[in-house]
């Protein structure tokens, strides 16, 4: 079985994330794309939308797609989970012959700082979703999504133009309510 893992905060999920999902399904030779929202990103101190809300948004957007599985492994841990831990969990579950790990190009600069990076690098093939024309190392796959969207911009400005239509209204209401509190 060939699998790909796309993890993230999805705070909120947006058209950039959607491009990654659709490109991965189209371009990668995989049997399953596992989308795994984090409880909290190991490199962040907090999140805006709680984990249940982010999981529901992700499930609503992509849970119905063929080959897609929405996984709550990291959320169930109730703590920051390094990628290597999620990868090992999925290896035990699926014993894949090929394992792709989808990450944003913005992570490349600090990738070597990821927990147990050498082991992680030996277990997966990195697939990079490029959003700012960042140079991709030759040993990584380039997904060529080139969507320049950041969840932080959506949260800060309440501009939901780049939020997927299916959840646009509820995302706007959710963050408006957070800003009022």
UniProtKB/Swiss-Prot annotation:
Q: Is rRNA-binding found in the keyword set? A: no
What does the record give under GO molecular function? Answer: ATP binding; nicotinate-nucleotide adenylyltransferase activity
Query: Which EC numbers does the record give?
Result: 2.7.7.18
Looking up InterPro entries in the UniProt record yields: Cyt_trans-like (IPR004821), NadD/NMNAT (IPR005248), Rossmann-like_a/b/a_fold (IPR014729)
Please give the catalytic activity noted in the UniProt record: nicotinate beta-D-ribonucleotide + ATP + H(+) = deamido-NAD(+) + diphosphate
Pfam families noted in UniProt:
CTP_transf_like
Q: Which GO terms describe its biological process?
A: NAD biosynthetic process
Give the main EC class. transferase
Where does this protein act, in terms of pathway? Cofactor biosynthesis; NAD(+) biosynthesis; deamido-NAD(+) from nicotinate D-ribonucleotide: step 1/1
Which keywords has UniProt assigned to this entry? ATP-binding, NAD, Nucleotide-binding, Nucleotidyltransferase, Pyridine nucleotide biosynthesis, Transferase
Question: What family does the entry list?
Answer: Belongs to the NadD family.
Q: Summarize the protein's role.
A: Catalyzes the reversible adenylation of nicotinate mononucleotide (NaMN) to nicotinic acid adenine dinucleotide (NaAD).
How is this protein named in the record? Probable nicotinate-nucleotide adenylyltransferase
The species is Campylobacter jejuni subsp. jejuni serotype O:2 (strain ATCC 700819 / NCTC 11168)
Tell me what gene encodes this: nadD
């Amino acid at each position: 079985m060939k699998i790909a893992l796309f993890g993230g905060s999805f705070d909120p999920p947006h058209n950039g994330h959607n491009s990654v999902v659709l490109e991965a399904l189209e371009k990668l030779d995989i049997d399953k794309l596992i989308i795994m929202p984090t409880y909290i990103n190991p490199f962040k101190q907090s999140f805006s939308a709680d984990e249940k809300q982010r999981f529901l948004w992700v499930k609503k957007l992509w849970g119905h797609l063929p080959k897609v599985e929405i996984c709550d492994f990291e959320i169930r841990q109730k703590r920051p989970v390094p990628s290597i831990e999620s990868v090992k969990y999925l290896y035990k579950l699926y014993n894949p012959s090929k394992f792709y790990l989808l990450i944003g190009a913005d992570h490349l600069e600090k990738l070597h700082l990821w927990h147990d990076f050498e082991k992680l690098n030996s277990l997966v093939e990195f697939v990079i979703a490029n959003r700012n024309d960042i140079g991709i190392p030759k040993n990584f796959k380039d997904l060529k999504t080139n969507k320049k969207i950041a969840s932080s911009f959506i949260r800060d400005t309440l501009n939901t133009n780049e939020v997927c239509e299916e959840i646009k209204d509820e995302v706007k209401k959710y963050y408006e309510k957070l800003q009022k509190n």
